[in-house]
Every structure is written in C-alpha cells, then in structure tokens.
C-alpha cells in the first residue's frame, strides 16, 4: 500500500475516534443539526475504518508468518499463510481504494427530473412522454415516489416539457448520469410513408436542494407573477389566478407551476424547483471545470451532449459515453435501467480510481 494511502486511512481512523467523542458530549445532543451532521459523518467513516482495521489484521498475520519461516517445522505452513495473506491484502487494498473514492454528498437525495422536447416536433413530445414513463416505471421498481411538479402537454400527447420529483433514498445517485440529449430513431405514428424519423429530448436530473443550507434565495431577487391556469386538450381552466411564475432575476431562471388548484401549493412547488435549478447551475459549472481538468467522459454537466440513442427498428439502445449497446430496447423503455445505470456508475468509479491513483 502506498504511504500516502495508508496515511489517509490513519487520518480517517483518528477522525472516527474524534467523532465518537464529540457525539458523546451533552452539547452535541442538545444541537440536533450538529448531531445529524456528526452522525452522517460517522456512518461514512465507520465502514472505511472497519475495512482498514481488517486489512491491518491480515498484514499483521503475514508479518507473524514471515517470522516463522526460520523454523523448519513451521516453514511450509508459514509459506501457505503468507501466500493466502498476500492475496487477501491485494483484494482488501482494492476494496479500500473504492471506499476512499470521493462521495457525492447529494447521492442519497431525492431529485427533480426535467424532460424537454427538442428537435422533432410532435414526435419529440411523444418521446418525452415515453421517457417519463420509463423513469416512472424504474422509480416504482425501487419503491420511490413520483410526483408531477409541472407539465406542458402537446396536442397529440406527450409533453413539450415536464418536471417531476422522484422521492427516494439514493435516487439522485442512481439517476444523475441521465442528464443530456436522448435521441430516438423510429417511425412516428403520424408518418404515413413508414419512414424512420430522428428526434431528440433533453433530460436534466437535479438533486433536491436542502432548504436549510444548500441555496440561499434572496426574496428581492424574485419576480412572482400569478395567472390563470390552462391546459391542452380540454382540461379544466381555473377561474382564479392559481398558476405561479417565478423569475430569478440575477440568473434569468424561470419556473412555472399550474398543476395544483391552490396558488400557495403551486408557489411552494415552483420554489422547490427553482432552488434545485440554482443548485444544479452551481454544480454544472463546477463539474464542467473538473471534467475539463480530468477529461471526464461522464458527469461533465453538459446538457447539450448527445448521451444515448434509442433505435426502435433495431431494438437497440446505445450509450455513447461508454460505447455500450444493449439489444433490449423494449425492456429498457419499461423501466429496466439497472444495466445502463450500473455500467455508467462503474465507469465513473473507474475514472475516480484513476484520479485517486494520481493524487495519492
């Protein structure tokens, strides 16, 4: 093990002792915010320190076996123990490297998923609806809750734009690499000649902002307009100004919510989405800088990047960032995303390991 890696692990072991001492103090118990932060830190430290202690135990066993090599009666057994121990040390060191990877503090959070129709008109809007159904099915299989925050339906079905909140432990960590341009190649329902058309949608995945600490929104930076809600296809039209449009003047970000009959609830939803967008803007600027430095393939924060193609005639889905092609389009559109999300996460960890090896 590299001395720098050992030193880092020793620091974490020492920090765990400090955190345990702090959690035992009466002052900490009286401050719930501090108690929660320390408890979260302890939960992250404990598995790393436990794995390091196990590693040290195996290392000590190998050292003891090496001392036994000089005894002719014990030499054969000692050689076996050394061989087995060194193999375990190699495995444990690889596992410790994974545990040392920087954790995204947002991975455990719920998220806002925004899908916008792009090139392709009505067909693009229909595909937006298909993507929403795909993500909703995936969320349901994992026991997450999906709530529509805002929607703008198209005349033929689907959505010009739709924003949903996906509430569940680890939702953002699993879906954060879905941001980008999704391209579909298929024969549209409106195509009489049977020709294949190409259209695209843009997906944005944003972690839910912590109202207490993540984003501070100055009320004087907001312009709030109310108007009467309306819907496509003969939906009800409110007779009161229940719809809300919030503009964040410094950034120009605009959020509209009109799905609820209550103006107060629409305003609450719009503020949640605005906070997530502001947090997302900060994150993407940081990720773009880091990606340029690391030459990262995924997680660059670039929403215009074409990340995936769904080819219906061939029944295939291709993720262009990792050159992965799966011939299971129907299952994927029904929400079977684990193979895709797992491969993206593995690639991200490989990039992190390469960077960690460079830094340690």
UniProtKB/Swiss-Prot annotation:
GO terms for cellular component: cytoplasm. Methylated by PrmC. Methylation increases the termination efficiency of RF1. SUPFAM superfamilies: Release factor. It comes from the Bacteria. Keywords: Cytoplasm, Methylation, Protein biosynthesis. Belongs to the prokaryotic/mitochondrial release factor family. This is Peptide chain release factor 1.
């Amino acid at each position: 093990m590299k001395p720098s890696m050992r030193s880092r692990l020793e620091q974490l072991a020492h920090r765990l002792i400090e955190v345990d001492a702090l959690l035992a103090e009466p002052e900490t118990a009286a401050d719930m915010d501090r108690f929660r932060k320390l408890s979260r830190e302890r939960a992250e430290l404990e598995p790393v320190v436990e794995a390091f202690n196990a590693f040290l135990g195996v290392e000590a066993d190998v050292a003891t076996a090496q001392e036994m090599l000089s005894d002719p009666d014990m030499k054969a057994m000692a050689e076996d123990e050394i061989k087995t121990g060194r193999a375990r040390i190699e495995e444990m060191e690889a596992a410790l490297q994974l545990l040392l990877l920087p954790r995204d503090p947002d991975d455990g959070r719920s998220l806002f998923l925004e899908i916008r129709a792009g090139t392709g008109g009505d067909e693009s809007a229909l595909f937006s609806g298909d993507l929403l159904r795909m993500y909703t099915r995936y969320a349901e299989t994992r026991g997450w809750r999906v709530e529509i925050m805002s929607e703008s339906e198209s005349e033929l079905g689907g959505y010009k734009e739709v924003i949903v909140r996906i509430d569940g432990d680890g939702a953002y960590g699993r879906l954060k690499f879905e941001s980008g341009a999704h391209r579909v190649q298929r024969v549209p329902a409106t195509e009489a000649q049977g020709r294949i058309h190409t259209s695209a949608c843009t997906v944005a995945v944003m972690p839910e902002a912590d109202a207490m600490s993540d984003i501070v929104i100055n009320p004087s930076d907001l312009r709030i307009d109310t108007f009467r809600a309306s819907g496509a296809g003969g939906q009800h039209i409110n007779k009161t100004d229940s719809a809300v449009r919030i503009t964040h003047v410094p950034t120009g970000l605009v959020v509209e919510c009109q799905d609820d009959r209550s103006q107060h609830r629409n305003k609450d939803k719009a503020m949640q989405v605005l906070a997530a967008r502001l947090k997302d803007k900060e994150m993407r600027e940081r990720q773009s800088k880091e990606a340029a430095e690391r030459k990262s393939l995924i997680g660059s924060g670039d929403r215009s990047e074409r990340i995936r193609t769904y080819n219906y005639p061939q029944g295939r889905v291709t993720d262009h960032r990792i050159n992965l092609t799966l011939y299971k389009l129907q299952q994927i559109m029904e929400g079977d995303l684990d193979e895709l999300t797992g491969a993206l996460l593995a690639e991200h960890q490989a990039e992190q390991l390469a960077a960690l090896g460079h830094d340690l």
